[in-house]
């Protein structure tokens, strides 16, 4: 293609799946470019060796497979959870938060290998194309970015399957013998889209769920756990200190076994359309409940309410792909400042899809049982003071009422 005639070497974000395997072959045949592959171990729960073997089978000489699980949770997931970030009230941003990390590594590998372009497998209809590319341009304004879904002649996944068969590219099959759903997975979540899921009126089949058992079949006995926090980040489970990735993986196990973290939603994509997806975020759902609980006793009311006001904007920036933007970094600085005293332990009960906070304690707690007790508070609070407080706050309301009744 004349558009990319000057491109000699491309770093491809490669999963080993249908789309990126076809993209790899397309880059070789249509552009005549040398392809370097990058596969990230984000905790998706798959063996990555098949991706290496498939890349080798397709003639790739430079193959990068990197374990980025700790970096992912430490530098991306945990900062996001300090903000309690949720998009449109329900989505915990599992796909969104992984894209800037992948772009960061693509840019690093392009520099290391002398590549003049990067490529990704995101479609021209979705959010991921925006997330990958905004992140890449923020890190290297001169990088060329190839998005084959916007350039090639394929119009459907059926055509992709035909191309794969023509070029003898293996395609995984699901339990029903068909090409799989469009799936994204990492240590934080998994998502499924496409096929019958495109009809939002129909319940998702049970076999779509990969990370959790059904709440109906979860154990009849509740699971009790304790999560410890320091400066807003989870650091331990049941008193055992764990690395960020290990901790999230363990929470995923607890969530999976108790049917926690399933979400069926229709969301508003950045590009303007609505899409339906089935998401599973077992560990993240538990972590969010625990973080909110420890904040409830350690954050001042003003700081807590300001955080709640900033959160939707912060979540939107991540969803739209602006992780490396100055405004996200400004918000992050404010959020991180609020977390200095967010430490302690939260006790949770996990039962049939539910996460229930049943206890919270902290050496930095602002909760005072002496102030709130219904019993004798030994002079800690003079209830007579409330009269003046109410009178001053009622001043403008009484003034308005006096005017309006005339």
UniProtKB/Swiss-Prot annotation:
<protein>
    <recommendedName>
        <fullName>Argininosuccinate synthase</fullName>
        <ecNumber>6.3.4.5</ecNumber>
    </recommendedName>
</protein>
<feature type="binding site">
    <location>
        <position position="128"/>
    </location>
    <ligand>
        <name>L-aspartate</name>
    </ligand>
</feature>
<feature type="binding site">
    <location>
        <position position="267"/>
    </location>
    <ligand>
        <name>L-citrulline</name>
    </ligand>
</feature>
<keyword id="KW-0436">Ligase</keyword>
<dbReference type="InterPro" id="IPR001518">
    <property type="entry name" value="Arginosuc_synth"/>
</dbReference>
<comment type="pathway">
    <text>Amino-acid biosynthesis; L-arginine biosynthesis; L-arginine from L-ornithine and carbamoyl phosphate: step 2/3.</text>
</comment>
<dbReference type="GO" id="GO:0006526">
    <property type="term" value="P:L-arginine biosynthetic process"/>
</dbReference>
<dbReference type="GO" id="GO:0000053">
    <property type="term" value="P:argininosuccinate metabolic process"/>
</dbReference>
<keyword id="KW-0028">Amino-acid biosynthesis</keyword>
<feature type="binding site">
    <location>
        <position position="91"/>
    </location>
    <ligand>
        <name>L-citrulline</name>
    </ligand>
</feature>
<dbReference type="GO" id="GO:0004055">
    <property type="term" value="F:argininosuccinate synthase activity"/>
</dbReference>
<dbReference type="InterPro" id="IPR048268">
    <property type="entry name" value="Arginosuc_syn_C"/>
</dbReference>
<feature type="binding site">
    <location>
        <position position="279"/>
    </location>
    <ligand>
        <name>L-citrulline</name>
    </ligand>
</feature>
<feature type="binding site">
    <location>
        <position position="123"/>
    </location>
    <ligand>
        <name>L-aspartate</name>
    </ligand>
</feature>
<keyword id="KW-0055">Arginine biosynthesis</keyword>
<feature type="binding site">
    <location>
        <position position="40"/>
    </location>
    <ligand>
        <name>ATP</name>
    </ligand>
</feature>
<feature type="binding site">
    <location>
        <position position="131"/>
    </location>
    <ligand>
        <name>L-citrulline</name>
    </ligand>
</feature>
<feature type="binding site">
    <location>
        <position position="191"/>
    </location>
    <ligand>
        <name>L-citrulline</name>
    </ligand>
</feature>
<dbReference type="Pfam" id="PF00764">
    <property type="entry name" value="Arginosuc_synth"/>
</dbReference>
<dbReference type="GO" id="GO:0005524">
    <property type="term" value="F:ATP binding"/>
</dbReference>
<keyword id="KW-0067">ATP-binding</keyword>
<dbReference type="GO" id="GO:0005737">
    <property type="term" value="C:cytoplasm"/>
</dbReference>
<comment type="subunit">
    <text>Homotetramer.</text>
</comment>
<dbReference type="InterPro" id="IPR048267">
    <property type="entry name" value="Arginosuc_syn_N"/>
</dbReference>
<feature type="binding site">
    <location>
        <position position="182"/>
    </location>
    <ligand>
        <name>L-citrulline</name>
    </ligand>
</feature>
<feature type="binding site">
    <location>
        <position position="96"/>
    </location>
    <ligand>
        <name>L-citrulline</name>
    </ligand>
</feature>
<dbReference type="InterPro" id="IPR024074">
    <property type="entry name" value="AS_cat/multimer_dom_body"/>
</dbReference>
<feature type="binding site">
    <location>
        <position position="127"/>
    </location>
    <ligand>
        <name>L-citrulline</name>
    </ligand>
</feature>
<feature type="binding site">
    <location>
        <position position="121"/>
    </location>
    <ligand>
        <name>ATP</name>
    </ligand>
</feature>
<dbReference type="InterPro" id="IPR018223">
    <property type="entry name" value="Arginosuc_synth_CS"/>
</dbReference>
<feature type="binding site">
    <location>
        <begin position="13"/>
        <end position="21"/>
    </location>
    <ligand>
        <name>ATP</name>
    </ligand>
</feature>
<dbReference type="GO" id="GO:0000050">
    <property type="term" value="P:urea cycle"/>
</dbReference>
<keyword id="KW-0547">Nucleotide-binding</keyword>
<dbReference type="Pfam" id="PF20979">
    <property type="entry name" value="Arginosuc_syn_C"/>
</dbReference>
<feature type="binding site">
    <location>
        <position position="127"/>
    </location>
    <ligand>
        <name>L-aspartate</name>
    </ligand>
</feature>
<comment type="similarity">
    <text>Belongs to the argininosuccinate synthase family. Type 1 subfamily.</text>
</comment>
<dbReference type="InterPro" id="IPR023434">
    <property type="entry name" value="Arginosuc_synth_type_1_subfam"/>
</dbReference>
<keyword id="KW-0963">Cytoplasm</keyword>
<dbReference type="InterPro" id="IPR014729">
    <property type="entry name" value="Rossmann-like_a/b/a_fold"/>
</dbReference>
């Amino acid at each position: 293609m004349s558009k990319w005639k000057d491109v000699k070497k491309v770093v491809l974000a490669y999963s080993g799946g249908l789309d990126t395997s076809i993209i790899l072959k397309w880059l070789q045949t249509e552009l005549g470019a040398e392809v370097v592959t990058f596969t990230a171990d984000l905790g998706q729960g798959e063996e990555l060796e098949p991706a290496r073997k498939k890349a080798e089978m397709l003639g790739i000489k430079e193959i990068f497979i990197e374990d980025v699980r700790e970096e992912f949770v430490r530098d991306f997931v945990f900062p996001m959870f300090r903000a309690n970030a949720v998009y449109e009230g329900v989505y915990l941003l599992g796909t969104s938060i992984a894209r800037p990390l992948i772009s960061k590594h693509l840019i690093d590998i392009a520099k290391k290998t002398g590549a003049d372009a990067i490529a990704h497998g995101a479609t021209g209809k979705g959010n991921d194309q925006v997330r990958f590319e905004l992140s890449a341009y923020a890190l290297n304004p001169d990088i060329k970015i190839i998005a084959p879904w916007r350039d090639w002649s394929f119009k459907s996944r059926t055509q992709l399957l035909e191309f794969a068969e023509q070029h003898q590219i293996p395609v995984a099959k699901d339990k029903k013998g068909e090409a799989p759903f469009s799936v994204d997975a990492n240590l934080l979540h998994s998502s499924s889209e496409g096929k019958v899921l495109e009809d939002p009126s129909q319940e998702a089949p049970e076999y779509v769920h990969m990370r959790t058992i059904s709440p109906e079949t979860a154990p009849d006995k509740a699971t009790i756990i304790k999560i410890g926090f320091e400066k807003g980040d989870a650091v331990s489970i049941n008193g055992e200190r764990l690395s960020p990735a290990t901790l999230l993986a363990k929470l995923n196990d607890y969530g999976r076994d108790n049917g926690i973290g399933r979400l069926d939603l229709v969301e508003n994509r950045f590009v303007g359309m609505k899409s339906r997806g089935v998401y599973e975020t077992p560990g993240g759902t538990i972590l969010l409940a625990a973080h909110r609980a420890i904040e409830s006793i350690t954050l001042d009311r003003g700081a807590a309410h300001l955080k709640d006001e900033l959160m939707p904007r912060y979540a939107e920036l991540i969803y739209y792909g602006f992780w490396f933007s100055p405004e996200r970094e400004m918000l992050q600085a404010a959020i991180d400042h609020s977390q200095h005293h967010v430490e302690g332990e939260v006790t949770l009960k996990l039962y049939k899809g539910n996460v229930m906070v049943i206890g919270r304690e902290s050496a930095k707690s602002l909760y005072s049982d002496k102030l709130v007790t219904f019993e004798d508070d030994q002079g800690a609070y003079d209830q007579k003071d409330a009269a003046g407080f109410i009178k001053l706050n009622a001043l403008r309301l009484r003034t308005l009422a006096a005017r309006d009744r005339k």
